Amino acid sequence: MIQHDQRTAVWRRLGTNVIGLTPAEALAKAGADYEVGIVPLVASVPDTLVSAVAGQEMSVAKRVPRKNLTYRLDNGEPIAPVGARYHVVQTKEVLSLVEAMTGAGWQPEFAGTFNNNSAVFMAGKMDMALKTREIDPYLCFVNSFDGSTGVKFACTPFRPFCTNQIRAIFTKRGERPVISLRHTTHILKRADTARELLGLTTAYYRYMDEQVERLLDKVLTEQMLSQALDIVAPIKQDAPDFVRERKEQKRAMLVHTLRTSPTIEDRDRDSAWGLYNAMTELEQWNRDQFPTQAQAEKMFGNHLGMVPMTNPSDRMLRVLTAPYFG
């Protein structure tokens, strides 16, 4: 397992330190202030008739129906194919929204690009105090150019004690509050977006803080621990021996992490919050080497998305917060 003093938050890994800079300065320093163009997508396809006459493989350029291509205007590098109705929103066009959030207490700390320059991001902490002090209230701004999402602000809770990014945590519908604006010509007409975003972010972190406090207060009995283990690492009676052994190892490793990890306070080892953090720690850091660039980008994308709770830590959370648990 990667030791806690060697861990790095994913936005620090992918981005550039921009603390103290304005949003425009942050984008420039991170090399994320480029503009994006869009052109019809053309493919080079084999021309069988000409190839037969020429005696070698020849190709012809053909327009791909209902598809365009985004590309960087500064260097001409292609980014991604998109639909014919896709509208590019330049990052500089939404800077007023970003600046409105900085005026409300959000300060970008890291900025950069990921997924082959198909998205730019800024990540920073909201200026708000949480009672439990277990989570730092981070917010990420993202603008993509590959059609995967629009302009997005996503709550990305971060636990500094173990450098864990907490995904899909403590929500009523299994999603984190995310304002995502599709790339259309109407995107810049939403004057109330900053106010809506601030309200959702504040409400989300207040609600999350309450749930953390409940988990801290929930004493973890042996019966509750066994029940949680049966959810995240169930062992069927008719399972082959090698499957049972693998599951038993996973369960034992989780309990060992709960009892010994230096990132979990001794007072929390018998709490539901301690068990949840042991699960997230194993999920993110139980590896022999740091994630590759591609793995880090995938991890970051998962934390930014509005996705159902499917990871073991997500299933663990559902168990720990269920009314019947305990």
Predicted regions and their residues:
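Ser/Thr-rich, low-complexity intrinsically disordered terminal regions
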Residues: 103-134, 233
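N-terminal low-complexity, intrinsically disordered segments
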Residues: 1-114
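Intrinsically disordered, low-complexity regions enriched in serine/threonine
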Residues: 1-52, 128-326
